[in-house]
Amino acid sequence: MCGVVGLVSKEPVNQRLYDALLLLQHRGQDAAGIGTLDGLTFHSYKAMGLVRDVFRTRNMRDLTGNIGIGHVRYPTQGCASSNQESQPFYVNAPYGIMFAHNGNLTNAEEVKDNLWNVDRRHINTTSDSEVLLNVLADELSQAVKPGEKFSPEAAFEAVKGVHRRVKGSYAVVALIAGKGLLAFRDPHGIRPLCFGTRVNADGSKDYLVSSESVTMVGLEFQFERDVAPGEAVFISQDGEFSCAQCAEHPTLNPCAFEFVYFARPDSVIDGISVYGARLRLGEYLANEVASHINLSEIDCVMPIPDSSRPAAQQLAQKLNIPYREGFIKNRYIGRTFIMPGQTTRKKSVRQKLNAMPVEFEGKNILLVDDSIVRGTTMEQIVRMARESGAKKVYVASSAPRVMYPNVYGIDMPTRAELICGHGESAEEVAKRIGADAVVYQTVEGLKDALTDLNPRVEQFDCSCFDGVYVTGDITKEYLDKLEADRMKPKAPAAGDDE
């Protein structure tokens, strides 16, 4: 999972790209990068770390131009500690393309082999984003023959070729030297992408493309709409906007985990308020709690900060149980789930959260979290609650059991790492994490909570909950190979302490 942004303006874009990446920081903490286009010259800077730590005044001054893209990285493919695989990526032909991608290709190895053997294109990293960039470059070379002029229609033909050749999830922003900004979304709409406008004094428009609508508010742009599944949009350097459907059979299947955890609560994705979705999840979860736990035994409902707070508040209100804040979050620690490496996650939990004994002593507590993926965090949190004096500790998850690998860009690709990876029951999970009981959202409840807010979205990617992979290419053999590759020891990158 990553965050991407693209901007076409009448003014220099470097500062606004930086501001947009700050608003998308929750989508990736591993690395950040910005690329701009000034005439026919690309400028870029990228490095490991948070946005505020990567960019300095001297870097920003070099990022000249009125058109640019940005990226925050959460590693799912390639080495988590390699600056070489930070984005944007670049190829010099055709024209020169700078590229940023959010998602994960499921046929990257096959496509990579084809690029080498047929198209004679070399891939220098293990990142599937570089593979996708080279497919786009190859298709654009075919769409614009020697002697022909570039056009938005040629760019759309190239995107059609991309859709035919690659599978998986992808939301892309790309700069084409001397031409403009191209953005497109995979035919299933798994990863989010939207755009907005701002009218200048002379009546011209600036365009902003982003993973989440929150950037539109922060940069004072008017949200226009989501990029449709399979659609591509092109904004020329002069601000001319074009769009086209580039997929043969597009379907909308947004990732349910965006609403559960990843996206900011003040974003709206495919017409669904993320905050509203989390409130609805709390209502549906309340029904499950009432069915599995004697409500008279619960003294208070308590969220695990921050993403579970709306669900916990709504659950407490519906069940008429007092709501309390028992954990204080250290806001200088990153999001635990998206930290690379299990060791790092375990180490960070107690640094991230501190329990207040006054809210726990002698009470039966219902802890509400957005999800229980590996169980790493929750096991330690339950222990902290008991150490702080709780008599009983119940746990409720606003997401269903995570039982299957995710192959579309979320860092939980093997069953061996999942606490429910072999179909473990709620009772077995409770024993494992040391809780008195565990209650899960149902898959039906999750889907209903989301469709309640936008009935036009009829399908979601819930593959990590129900094992249904919307791209149709995921087999047992694929998952077995993925798990085997994941379990192989990796050589530490230069500068690694572990």
What do the predicted segments below correspond to?
Residues V301-I304, S308-L315, L319, Y323, ...:
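Extended, hydrophobic alpha-helical segments in both membrane/secreted and soluble proteins
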Residues M1-P229, F234-C300, I304, K392:
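Conserved short alpha-helical segments that host acidic/polar catalytic motifs at enzyme active sites
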Residues H163, G178-G180, R185, K205, ...:
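PRPP-dependent phosphoribosyltransferase catalytic core
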Residues P12-N14, T76-Q77, N107, L181, ...:
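Flexible loop/turn segments at secondary-structure boundaries
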Residues V135-E153, P305, Q313-R335:
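Amphipathic alpha-helical
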Residues F55, E130-V135, Y323-G334, R432-L450:
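A conserved beta-strand->alpha-helix junction
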Residues A31-G35, E325-N330, V393-A399:
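A generic structural motif
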